[in-house]
Amino acid sequence: MRASRSSGPSAHPGHAGHAGHGGPPAPIAGTYITEVKLPAIVDYILAAKRAAGALGLVVGFSLQEIDELNIAVTQACENAIAAANEQWGRGNGQLKLLFKTQPRRLEVEVRSVPPRAVEMQQAVRPARRDEAVDYESVGVNMIRLFVDELRYHRDQQTGIMRMRMVKYLIE
């Protein structure tokens, strides 16, 4: 996981609610970007959920809000994995997650990205989808229930899927 600060006021020592404060962490004061790259394999969704949950705590989300965020991230990852499997073959793509933490909000972008090895891209044929049900649309509609903003795009030429979700802290 890689985090970088993009702008905003400086953080104060002990600001994130470290042990000994006796309460939930104080919400962050600046804007930070964290990037996570994972294999496009269902088993790795847990790592994406852990990152989302931890960053949700940093923003100040309640446990219910974190649960809702985790449901949305899980579904977005499942859609990205399906897009990667269809485009580059099962287990060959990657997921790229960008988390942008700001005061009172967390933005999550999930993308399916091609495998690194060019040889693999040329050798792998896209998997076929035999399902009669459009699981992609069902998943996108489910995500809308748990986030405040959603943008979805799937490039028909490259097969890359991009989903941007925003959840706001509501008090």
Identify the residue ranges that each predicted region occupies:
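Conserved beta-strand-loop-beta-strand hairpin that lines the nucleotide-binding pocket
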Residues: 1-35, 81-171
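Generic hydrophobic secondary-structure packing signal
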Residues: 44-48, 52, 68, 72, ...
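Generic detector of contiguous secondary-structure segments
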Residues: 52-67, 92-100
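Conserved ATP-binding N-box helix of the HATPase_c
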Residues: 63-90
